[in-house]
C-alpha cells in the first residue's frame, strides 16, 4: 500500500507505542487520526478525537467524525489498552470480578469494537490502486498472551483473545480485501516501564535473549509500517520480543 495521503487511525495514540506509531506513520506521509480517552492529550496528529473504545456509541460517533473531517481510514492500529496486575487471590481476598471485567472490556472488547466499526467503513472504499486492497487492521496483543505471569490472569486472557480472533477475522474480512494482523510486543520502553527504578529496568532488559535491552516504541512503529506494506502478511501474530520467553 502506498503511504502518501492515506488515512491511518491509531487508538491509544496519545502515549507509548500508539504515539510512536502515529508519529512514524505521519512522517511516512500518512494522514493520522488518533482516538484516545485522554481529554488533554497533546498530539501532532492531523485529527484527535476523544473516544472510549469500550462504548459502541463512542466508537461509532468517532468514526462518523473521522469520515466527516478527514475521510475513511485505510489503516487501523489498535493500541488502546490497560495492564493492571492483580492476583486471583490476594491479601484482600478474591480478585473483584469487576477488575477482571474491566481489563477484558478495554483490551479485548475495545479492540473488537473498533475493528468491527472500522472494517464496516473500510468495506465501502474503492480498492487501493497499487495493492488492490481496501484496508489493513493491526491489533496489539502481548507476549503475555502466551507466557503470562503471576498477577496477569486478566491481562493474559484479554491479549490471548486478541491473538485468537486474528485468523478468523482475517478469513472473514478477506471478502472485503481487508487484511488483519496482530503484533505481540515483549518488554517495550513505554512510560510505564520507564517510570520504574533503573535497576528494575536493567533487570528486565537482562531477561531478553538478544538484543539485551528493552524494545523501543519506534521499533513497534517500524513493524507496523512493514505489516502495512507487505501484502502477503495476513492472519498473522508477530512477536516483537528479542526472543524473550517469560518464565
Please annotate each region the language model reported.
Residues 2-33:
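Canonical Rossmann dinucleotide-binding motif of NAD(H)/NADP(H)-dependent dehydrogenases/reductases
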Residues 120, 170-172:
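Alpha-helical segment proximal to the catalytic Tyr-Lys
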Residues 83-101, 124-130, 151-154, 194:
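Conserved mid-core segment of classical short-chain dehydrogenase/reductases
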Residues 115, 158, 166:
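Active-site helix of classical SDR
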Residues 174, 179, 233-236:
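Short, small/polar-rich loop/turn modules that mediate ligand/substrate recognition or access, typified
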Residues 216-240, 245:
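C-terminal substrate-recognition "lid" of short-chain dehydrogenase/reductases
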Amino acid at each position: 500500500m502506498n503511504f502518501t495521503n492515506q488515512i491511518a487511525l491509531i487508538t491509544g495514540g496519545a502515549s507509548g507505542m500508539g504515539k510512536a506509531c502515529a508519529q512514524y506513520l505521519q512522517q511516512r506521509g500518512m494522514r493520522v487520526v488518533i482516538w484516545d480517552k485522554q481529554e488533554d492529550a497533546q498530539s501532532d496528529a492531523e485529527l484527535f478525537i476523544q473516544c472510549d473504545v469500550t462504548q459502541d456509541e463512542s466508537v461509532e460517533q468517532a468514526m462518523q467524525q473521522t469520515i466527516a473531517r478527514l475521510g475513511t481510514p485505510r489503516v487501523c492500529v489498535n493500541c488502546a489498552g490497560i495492564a493492571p496486575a492483580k492476583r486471583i487471590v490476594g491479601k484482600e481476598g478474591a480478585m473483584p470480578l469487576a477488575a477482571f471485567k474491566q481489563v477484558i472490556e478495554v483490551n479485548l472488547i475495545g479492540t473488537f469494537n473498533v475493528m468491527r466499526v472500522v472494517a464496516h467503513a473500510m468495506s465501502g472504499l474503492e480498492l487501493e490502486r497499487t495493492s488492490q486492497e481496501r484496508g489493513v487492521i493491526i491489533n496489539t496483543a502481548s507476549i503475555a498472551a502466551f507466557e503470562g505471569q503471576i498477577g496477569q490472569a486478566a491481562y493474559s486472557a484479554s491479549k490471548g483473545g486478541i491473538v485468537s480472533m486474528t485468523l478468523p477475522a482475517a478469513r472473514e474480512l478477506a471478502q472485503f480485501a481487508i487484511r488483519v494482523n496482530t503484533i505481540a510486543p515483549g518488554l517495550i520502553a513505554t512510560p510505564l516501564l520507564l517510570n520504574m527504578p533503573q535497576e528494575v529496568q536493567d533487570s528486565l532488559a537482562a531477561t531478553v535473549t538478544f538484543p539485551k535491552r528493552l524494545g523501543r516504541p519506534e521499533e513497534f512503529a517500524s513493524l507496523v509500517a512493514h505489516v502495512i506494506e507487505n501484502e502477503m502478511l495476513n492472519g498473522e501474530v508477530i512477536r516483537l520480543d528479542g526472543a524473550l520467553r517469560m518464565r
